[in-house]
Amino acid sequence: MRDVKKRKIAHEAPEHGSDTESTSSHKSVAQQDDPLETQDEATATESRPAPKSFKDLGIIDQLCEACETMGYKAPTPIQAESIPLALQGRDLIGLAETGSGKTAAFALPILQALMENPQSFFGLILAPTRELAFQISKSFESLGSTINVRCAVIVGGMDMVSQSIALGKKPHIIVATPGRLLDHLENTKGFSLRTLKYLVMDEADRLLDMDFGPLLDKILKVLPRERRTFLFSATMSSKVESLQRASLSNPLRVSVSSNKYQTVSTLLQSYLFLPHKHKDIYLVYLLNEFVGQSTIIFTRTVHETQRISFLLRSLGFGAIPLHGQLSQSARLGALGKFRSRSRDILVATDVAARGLDIPSVDVVLNFDLPTDSKTYVHRVGRTARAGKSGVAISFVTQYDVEIWLRIEGALGKKLKEYELEKDEVMVLAERVGEAQRQAIMEMKNFDEKRGTKAKKFGKGKRSRDEMDQEEG
């Protein structure tokens, strides 16, 4: 029985209870639901000074210069704990929140190993969404710019032939969503990962939440056993434990999260208790309050995302939608416009809650409450990043009280109600009503186009391409 050894940093609360890994034979993720057994723990008992630079971690000068160029001044906690172990050739489980610097934590050791032993198909990174895959590839290319690292992004919604050509050029690093990667492994002549040295499963909890388990099983079966594997996740669910046991060899666990529902101190959180029928009016009022600030509005459905985008545009706001049913080019275009601030309002489903590189968000508005506390934390975590301040306001209607109380319970505190003059809000009622009628007209056209597309492609099981996009 191989043990998973835990490594903790000084500010992490000690855990009681433990878990283990199965024997070396490959088992499917679905077969790994056994009760967790006792394991040994390797804890950092001595107080060690925090590393001041990437060079202190063992990163070579060439890559340190790339870090400096990218603005990485000092290692984050997950980088400080993970990189030295990865450089020792250990399999790793990294538990850390979005925005903690996970990508560099696995990219730097892989690039350093690549420099020592250059070869094609050296590393494979699996990601749950297309946007995250492109983002990871960009990080690899930037960090590896001085060594001319070649990356290929293999995701659904893009042309298979052009991707086959890219694979034929034998890139060093492949960043992929599971569905499209498996398509190429099964159908692209001459493509194989038999020589792969590194496998990374990023946002592993989301990979499994999106039903990629069976696809991961098939991918793992064709990868060489003699490889290093890194698994990064925000949470350690039973499904992630199963994936860990199926894919990692004697791993060390690094955790920098002491409370999975913790939010940063620079985030000002509050709520608005309001009638459901007046949500649009309150939304417009708040956007006028925060005019000029970078804002993400979270909704629960694709329909609401589009409707609110139409509503706000008719009122003169620079709003742009982001959801899983947009084409890949439209999604990347929306993110590009929001990052460049040519549009300062992003209306999104939870496709934008985690994993996307949006460096500066001032305000998060939960127009629709999420159904669970974990998603709430990931949503509001889009703002107040890297030491900056941020605001998060949640709309709580008469139908949302129970959900909101659960969220507050998970946070361990009561949040303040956002103060405003309701009479001032309702002054906007007539103007917003006109915009609502305009949005209804535009939604009819939008729904007709969606219906035509659905009929064209027919119904049935979800394709791998559809699984490669977050539904929303």
UniProtKB/Swiss-Prot annotation:
What are the recorded GO MF terms, alphabetically? ATP binding; ATP hydrolysis activity; RNA binding; RNA helicase activity
Disulfide bond annotation, renumbered to this chain:
none
InterPro entries given for it? DDX47/Rrp3_DEADc, DEAD/DEAH_box_helicase_dom, DEAD_box_RNA_helicase, Helicase_ATP-bd, Helicase_C-like, P-loop_NTPase, RNA-helicase_DEAD-box_CS, RNA_helicase_DEAD_Q_motif
**Domain spans labelled Helicase C-terminal:** 282-426
CDD domains given for it? Answer: DEADc_DDX47, SF2_C_DEAD
Using the record's annotation, list all stretches that form the Helicase ATP-binding domain.
Answer: 83-254
Give me any GO biological process, just one.
rRNA processing
Say which enzyme class the record assigns: hydrolase
Q: Where in the cell is it found?
A: Nucleus
General function of this protein = ATP-dependent rRNA helicase required for pre-ribosomal RNA processing. Involved in the maturation of the 35S-pre-rRNA and to its cleavage to mature 18S rRNA.
Family classification: Belongs to the DEAD box helicase family. DDX47/RRP3 subfamily.
Descriptive protein name: ATP-dependent rRNA helicase rrp3
Name the gene for this chain.
Answer: rrp3
